[in-house]
């Protein structure tokens, strides 16, 4: 005889997992569940509390998997060369990380891959027994680990290893926010790349006008003050602010002052310099200013390269991340 619609145990434990995850997040953050979902269970919008809760305009996507208890084991990790470059011989090294393994359908992983690493998708493993949540960025995991397995696409499922040190607590909130702000980081890198190309065709007489315009554009990007960002980026921020205050880059300003302190002439046009008009000589002051601005934009352009090489391996079960966090 009919007994009515049934609710499966998997649906119940899945709902429990989502509720535990929500309870771990800051109360001002907004979560939105997807029904039906096709791999992505919910999205998170980051807010900050001031006098009112204000959105930061940062979002990330989450796939939630729940179990009463996850088995932990120590994963042996071997050193490897940079996966963004052709294989190279590297110094042998070995690391060990405690991880939780979880099998995911390759169809879902391929969907995440198609979304691109500019839209971070996190896998969150919720353990009911301990009420703990562990996470890993699937977008980076696929790019830095999975696609370098020749058999990845041909398999029905793939094992993903989630480091147990990636736990959702107050420190974890900073990491989630770092992932959520990735699209604006990419927007910054793209803008700098465009500006740097333009500057290659600007002569020394127009350079300051272009720089004054460009530098105010990139300084407005809401990416510079985040605590997790690389020290290289903090250095770039400091360089930008020094220029905005003094009208010259810091290193070149020191070079000019050093020459002046030693009694040398910095204003006579007796120098030939890179990036300056090859048909006339310039002053040491002018040469330093022009070269400093090009140096600054080269430094800014390197931010995106560093991010691709290093930062997208943060919090992954890789040798590079172990080297970075232990340094």
Residue spans of the language-model regions?
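A short, surface-exposed helix-loop junction/capping segment
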Residues: 1-6
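A detector for short, charged/polar N-terminal pre-domain segments
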Residues: 7-11
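Catalytic centers of nucleases
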Residues: 13-82
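Detector for Asparagine
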Residues: 19, 74, 79-82, 103, ...
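Generic preference for flexible, low-structure residues
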Residues: 37, 47, 76-80, 139, ...
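Mixed-charge intrinsically disordered linker/loop segments at interdomain junctions
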Residues: 89-186
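Long, low-complexity, intrinsically disordered terminal regions
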Residues: 177-327
């Amino acid at each position: 005889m009919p007994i009515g619609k049934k609710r499966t145990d998997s649906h119940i434990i899945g709902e429990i997992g989502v509720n535990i995850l929500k309870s771990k997040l800051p109360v001002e953050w907004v979560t939105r569940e997807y029904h039906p979902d096709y791999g992505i269970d919910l999205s998170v919008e980051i807010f900050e509390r001031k006098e009112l809760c204000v959105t930061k305009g940062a979002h990330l996507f989450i796939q939630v998997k729940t179990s009463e208890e996850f088995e932990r084991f120590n994963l042996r990790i071997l050193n490897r060369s940079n996966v963004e470059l052709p294989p190279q011989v590297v110094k042998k090294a070995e690391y060990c990380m405690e991880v939780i393994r979880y099998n995911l359908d390759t169809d879902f992983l391929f969907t995440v891959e198609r979304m691109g690493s500019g839209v971070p998708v996190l896998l969150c493993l919720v353990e009911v027994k301990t009420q703990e949540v562990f996470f890993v960025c699937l977008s980076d995991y696929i790019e830095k680990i999975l696609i370098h397995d020749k058999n990845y696409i041909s398999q029905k499922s793939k094992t993903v290893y989630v480091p147990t040190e990636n736990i959702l607590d107050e420190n974890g909130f900073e990491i989630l926010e770092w992932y959520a702000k990735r699209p604006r980081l990419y927007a910054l890198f793209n803008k700098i790349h465009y500006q740097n190309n333009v500057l290659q065709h600007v002569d020394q007489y127009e350079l300051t006008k272009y720089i004054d315009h460009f530098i105010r554009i990139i300084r407005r990007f809401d990416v510079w003050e985040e605590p997790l960002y690389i020290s290289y980026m903090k250095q770039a921020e400091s360089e930008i602010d020094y220029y905005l205050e003094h009208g010259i880059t810091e290193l070149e300003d020191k070079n000019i002052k050093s020459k002046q302190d030693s009694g040398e002439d910095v204003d006579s046009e007796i120098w030939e310099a890179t990036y300056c008009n090859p048909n006339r000589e310039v002053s040491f002051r002018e040469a330093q200013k022009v070269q400093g601005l090009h140096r600054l934009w080269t430094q800014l352009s390197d931010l995106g390269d560093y991010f691709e090489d290093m930062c997208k391996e943060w919090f992954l079960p890789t040798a590079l991340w172990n080297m970075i966090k232990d340094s």
